[in-house]
């Protein structure tokens, strides 16, 4: 078998773990006559003409290169459908495309992650009538919209006043500036849930303004580790991108080598990172 893994590394600590999981799975498959090639865009933001060109060129290269299957950190493009129609088994990870463009998708359960975030804020915010905000990535990105939907659904059971859902397009500078504007416009803000890896700008804005509020973030990096340890960030919700890469490639192999069925969406269970269990992550 000849397999390909396609990734982007705009947030190296996040995307690198996905690629590491896929590489570890690829090493485990070496004894099964399986070749795995890895393609990654390492030149910055993923919402640029350059990254779009890389995606299209790489998908064409895979289509013309005799590959049997692809596991991709996906962004919507009709080329995924063309790839599948040409006989390549397409699977996506982290972010999905239209279901008819791929065979299965692996991700963490964003809806449940959003519900967890809302419940944590409800438990920890002493003045619950205060408004809360969600710092999201992209309005039309499925994993981001799923977390927002989960948060909104949970507030029907643990009532919170959602004052704002604002978007930063996975750009740390936009996250910082938009959070500064939010804090200035809403002096009573009680909490922010950051539903993407892009938390550094939000954290910087809150630090600079000296505001006391509940911060719940997503995933883990060196900055978040120290923020959780100090209590500045109350908790982070882990989507285990390493396991998405590892399990995603193994599932792709099993589907092709053994004709094993894979459910349409493979869900990874979100985990809560607190100061008390931080050493486990």
Where on the chain are the PLM-derived regions?
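Short hydrophobic segments within beta-strands
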Residues: 4-9, 93, 135, 193
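Hydrophobic alpha-helical
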Residues: 55-57, 65-85, 151, 167-225
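Flexible loop/hinge segments that line or gate small-molecule binding clefts
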Residues: 75-112, 221-234
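Amphipathic helical "hinge" segments at domain boundaries
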Residues: 1-53
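Short, solvent-exposed amphipathic alpha-helices that sit
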Residues: 13-31, 113-117, 142-161, 178, ...
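Hydrophobic alpha-helical segments within soluble ligand-binding/sensing domains
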Residues: 105-131, 175-176, 224, 239-257
């Amino acid at each position: 078998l000849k397999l390909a893994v396609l990734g982007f590394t705009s947030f190296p600590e996040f995307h690198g773990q996905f690629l590491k999981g896929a590489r570890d799975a690829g090493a485990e498959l070496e004894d099964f006559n399986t070749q795995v090639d890895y393609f990654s865009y390492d030149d910055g933001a993923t919402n640029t003409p350059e990254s779009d060109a890389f995606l299209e060129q790489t998908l064409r290269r895979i289509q013309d290169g005799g590959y049997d299957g692809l596991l991709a950190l996906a962004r919507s493009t009709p080329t995924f459908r063309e790839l599948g129609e040409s006989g390549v088994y397409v699977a996506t990870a982290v972010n999905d495309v239209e279901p008819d463009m791929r065979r299965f998708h692996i991700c963490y359960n964003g809806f449940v992650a959003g519900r967890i975030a809302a419940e944590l804020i409800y438990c920890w915010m002493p003045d619950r009538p205060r408004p809360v905000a969600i710092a999201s990535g992209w309005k039309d990105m499925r994993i981001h919209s799923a977390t927002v939907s989960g948060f909104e659904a949970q507030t029907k059971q643990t009532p919170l006043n959602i004052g704002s859902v604002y978007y930063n397009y996975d750009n740390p500078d936009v996250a910082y500036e938009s959070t500064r504007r939010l804090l200035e416009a809403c002096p009573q803000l009680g909490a922010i849930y950051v539903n993407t890896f892009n938390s550094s700008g939000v954290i910087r804005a809150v630090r600079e303004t000296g505001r006391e509020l509940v911060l719940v973030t997503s995933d883990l990096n060196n900055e978040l580790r120290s923020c959780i340890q100090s209590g500045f960030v109350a908790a982070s919700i882990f989507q285990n991108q390493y396991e998405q890469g590892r399990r995603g490639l193994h599932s792709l192999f099993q589907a092709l080598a053994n004709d094993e069925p894979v459910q349409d969406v493979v869900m990874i269970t979100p985990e809560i990172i607190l100061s008390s269990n931080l050493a486990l992550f």
